[in-house]
Amino acid sequence: MSDRKPVIISEEQLEEQRQYIQQIRLMPDAPKSYHVVTYGCQMNAHDSEILAGMLRDMGMEEAADRESADFVLFNTCCVRDNAERRALGNVTWLKEVRKKNPRLMIGVCGCMIQQPGMAEKILKQYRFVDLAFGTANLYCLPELMLKALESDHAVVEVEEQNTIAEGLPVQRLRHDAAYITIMYGCDNYCTYCIVPYVRGRERSRASARIIEEARELKADGVKEIMLLGQNVNSYGKGLQTPVTFAQLLKALDDVGIPRIRFMTSHPKDLSDELIDVMAHSKHILPQFHLPVQHGNDEILRRMNRHYNRAQYLDRVRKLREAIPAIGLTTDIIVGFPGETEEQFQDTLSLVREVGYDSAFTFIYSPRTGTGAAKMPNQVPEDVSSRRIQELLKVQEECQKKALKRFIGTEEEVLVEGFSRRSDTDVSGHGLHGLSVTFPGTESDVGEIVRVKIVGAKNNTLTGERI
């Protein structure tokens, strides 16, 4: 944990931003519509909700797409090279759109911009971009927008990530579900991961503020909250009065919101206390995303994961002993520097042993500034590609077996909308985190519906209303 205390953005600073918002509302040449393009994790998705909330307060309406917006903001990710390339490709595409709409404003923000020198590189290479800012400057969007509107050159703001900003407006994507960020940053420094460098060191919000936010969301009719943090299991360590994540969850369980989810968790910080709280809770869903990353001890050591295979499997065992029907998902990387065929086989055997309900699988992507990027014996692309296909095949087999256990059981599904494959089926997520589709209508959207599971296909369960 960093010795430096996080900087809490004061009410005076937030009021200053509100004044900038009012100034922009009165400007005749200010954009009338916006569109936020989001890449990456749920933390980014929630950041985009906050950005959209501020843009809404500036008097802008959300545009359906980039082509029809007066202001387009890219909230970027840099966890993998592909995410960066996608974002930059879409920024380039807007250059042509601007030829048709000279008043179009373009902004780029988020994790990619937080990397050293990246903002300057973007503005040099993409001279049509109007503003660029990092993860620590999200709350400053009104000020940066005003500067960009009043200036004939691009505005850049990238500060060190040691802040906590609360009380910002939020334009939620859904009325029935909401995110709550409980902490920011990460102190783990896994050798493949750039997150600590772009999100900063760990810093936790006060538990009282989090509980207050949950109560407000309950009063607003929210049926599900997802608690967010790069490593929620280490929540509370830097607070003046330390609070464990398990203690926070217990307090939130008492608030009475029907469904509580959280991510992401680090296996080394998964405590028996947390497992016990989950097992005896009323509202914490029986699902757990527990990234393993690899099945070989030597690779885990070089990844700086601070656990070995046996310790990880012990956590899985304890979770299943306490919550037998728990839904388990994970993240896995193939092609980490120096990974041998034998070590890769250890990953496959672990996947078979655990039997995950779902797995997010990735080919290792070197990130400048991380320890693994400097390691020798980088795995050839063709080898990594073959291995990921093997992993996907094994996981698909395991997933089929895992999902069959739900057939004949009952699930409570929070309906999110119509299925993409049928206009007579609705879709949502069940208690165990799995996607469930069943025949329904528009009136089901946003409601919790009890269904009987009658089938399983790919990564989706099918059901019938009870």
Q: Which residues does each PLM region occupy?
A:
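Terminal RNA-binding accessory module
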Residues: S2-D3, K374-I466
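Aromatic/acidic polysaccharide-binding cleft in carbohydrate-active enzymes
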Residues: T361-N377
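Proteins enriched for Cys/Gly/acidic motifs involved in redox and nucleic-acid/cofactor modification
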Residues: M1-Y235, E273, F288, A310-E321, ...
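Generic beta-strand/beta-sheet core signal
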Residues: V37, C109, V195, L228-Q230, ...
